[in-house]
């Protein structure tokens, strides 16, 4: 996450196991932790980290406006905030990220699977390689200005 809520600089949370040997049952077969806890002082960002994960679910599965300035870092100089997510699912590396420019109401998105581009969006134009390796182009008639294009593809297929 970058320029998101109280995090001005890029912050990353890595759920890959380390060499600790305690709680081996907390590690999945693929080397990813099954869970974690966040511990820290008041107002240190614990809830913001959890919010960044919750927002992905909200943006994908419920009606939520991305262009809202409420997610913008109050200490930042930029009108954009970004969130990126990396998953390991059935041996496939999934990278999904989006950036919101609240000043000009523009969203950019990118989805990669095993480093292959699957979806790309800039503003109200997008291209998906999920169903067709040559790509299917979409324009303002298909791409919502304030919602994730990945959500649109999911609910329209």
Model-derived features with residue positions:
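Pre-Walker A-like glycine/lysine-rich segment at the N-terminus of P-loop NTPase domains
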Residues: 1-54
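A generic structural motif
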Residues: 2-4, 86-90, 112-114
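Ser/Thr- (and often Asn-) enriched beta-sheet segments in non-cytosolic proteins
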Residues: 12, 86, 93-95, 108, ...
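Conserved P-loop NTP-binding catalytic core
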Residues: 31-37, 41, 50-103
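Electropositive, glycine-dotted interaction segments
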Residues: 97-157
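Residues in well-ordered beta-strands of folded domains
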Residues: 14-16, 86, 99, 151
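Intrinsically disordered, low-complexity boundary segments flanking structured domains
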Residues: 1-2, 72-73, 134-139
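Short loop/turn segments at connectors of secondary-structure elements within structured domains
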Residues: 7-9, 92, 105
């Amino acid at each position: 996450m970058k320029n998101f809520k109280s995090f001005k600089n890029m912050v990353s949370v890595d759920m890959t196991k380390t060499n600790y040997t305690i709680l081996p049952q907390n590690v999945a077969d693929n080397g990813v932790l099954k869970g974690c806890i966040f511990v820290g002082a008041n107002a240190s960002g614990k809830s913001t980290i959890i919010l960044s994960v919750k927002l992905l679910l909200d943006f994908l599965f419920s009606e939520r406006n991305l262009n809202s300035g409420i997610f913008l870092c109050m200490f930042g100089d930029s009108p954009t905030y970004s969130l990126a997510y990396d998953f390991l699912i059935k041996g496939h590396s999934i990278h999904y990220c989006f950036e919101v420019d609240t000043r000009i109401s523009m969203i950019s998105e990118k989805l990669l699977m095993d480093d292959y581009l699957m979806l790309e969006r800039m503003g109200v134009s997008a291209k998906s390689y999920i169903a067709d390796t040559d790509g299917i182009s979409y324009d303002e008639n298909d791409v919502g200005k304030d919602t994730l294009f990945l959500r649109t593809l999911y609910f329209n297929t």
